[in-house]
């Protein structure tokens, strides 16, 4: 089993989006919870919404060029299994062209 970081991208942060009605929020959270149930014991960290990212370099700090709106950390049998979970993720159904990046955690030699 390997660990995978899911990075959620969207054209706007949750705070910038039109607030959902309570019914819409309940439906969306139901989809996310159903997906988490599919991940099962492989869910290491469900994650949280993110906003206000910046890019830090030796030259200074600047606004992030890509909006990261959340993350999850999961464990899956292999990269293909992680991709299958990403393909079925409800984040992809959100309006505005939402995306998920999948990154495999790499072991650090000697640690």
Language-model-detected regions and their locations in the chain:
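Conserved, structured core segments of small domains
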Residues: 1-111
């Amino acid at each position: 089993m390997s660990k995978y970081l899911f990075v959620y991208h969207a054209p706007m942060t949750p705070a910038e989006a039109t607030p959902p009605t309570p019914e819409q929020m309940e439906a969306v959270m139901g989809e996310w919870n159903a997906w988490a149930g599919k991940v099962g014991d492989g869910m290491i960290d469900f994650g949280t919404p993110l906003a206000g990212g910046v890019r830090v370099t030796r030259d200074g700090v600047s606004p992030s060029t890509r909006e990261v709106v959340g993350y999850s950390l999961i464990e899956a049998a292999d990269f293909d299994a992680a991709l299958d979970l990403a393909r079925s993720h409800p984040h992809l159904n959100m309006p505005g062209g939402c995306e998920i990046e999948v990154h495999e955690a790499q072991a650090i030699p000697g640690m």
